[in-house]
């Protein structure tokens, strides 16, 4: 909980941060989209085409597009729960009628370089000039995440880069998804493993 408070205190100082309230234009939103008060959209690229939300979707969590790349596309009638954080520097595509529960984390990249010297340089740049000063990803690896239609991601799940979750799949609470999930299957655990067909 302490990390979350620090994270949001840093984010809120960013000029590209938008705390969603009444009638705040932040992205390309179709008719009937609801952005709940307290949700957040951080679009470091300040380009509305980088965050697209389909009609009748409900966003209670946070959507973040990094300054050096990324795109988030959410289909129609999908739900992003409170405390969920979806962060992209490559591409995250979420289908129609997807349920993403509270406190889910979806990240399409490593977040940091693997070499400690490179991490130190990046960290110092962020401290001195802000996260939005990063204009390239350096050696951070990113791979597209795809979540197909009618998927249910239960609470406290982590989905890592390069994962493709097939249509109608369910990911059990607290799972860490590092590999593709077949359509109409239930996976759970750390790492997430096949449990049964649906």
Question: Where does each model-flagged region fall?
Answer:
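Gly/Pro- and small hydrophobic-enriched strand-loop and loop-to-helix capping segments
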Residues: 178-184
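A generic "structured core" feature
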Residues: 170, 175-176
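Domain-scale signature associated with acetyltransferase and cell-envelope carbohydrate enzymes
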Residues: 1-114, 118-125, 131-132, 137-150, ...
């Amino acid at each position: 909980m302490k990390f979350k408070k620090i994270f949001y205190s840093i984010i809120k100082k960013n000029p590209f941060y938008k705390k969603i309230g009444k009638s705040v234009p932040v992205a390309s939103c179709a008719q009937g989209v609801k952005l709940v008060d307290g949700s957040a959209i951080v679009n470091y690229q300040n380009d509305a085409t980088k965050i697209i939300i389909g009609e009748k979707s409900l966003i209670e969590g946070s959507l973040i597009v990094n300054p050096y790349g990324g795109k988030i596309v959410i289909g129609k009638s999908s739900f992003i729960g409170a405390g969920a954080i979806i962060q992209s520097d490559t591409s995250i595509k979420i289908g129609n009628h997807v349920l993403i529960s509270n406190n889910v984390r979806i990240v399409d990249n490593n977040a940091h370089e693997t070499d400690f010297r490179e991490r130190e340089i990046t960290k110092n740049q962020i401290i001195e000039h802000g996260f939005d000063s990063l204009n390239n990803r350096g050696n951070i690896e990113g791979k597209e995440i795809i979540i197909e239609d009618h998927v249910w991601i239960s609470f406290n799940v982590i989905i890592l880069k390069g994962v493709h979750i097939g249509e109608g799949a369910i990911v059990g609470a607290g799972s860490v998804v590092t590999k593709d999930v077949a359509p109409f299957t239930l996976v759970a655990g750390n790492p997430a493993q096949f449990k049964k067909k649906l």
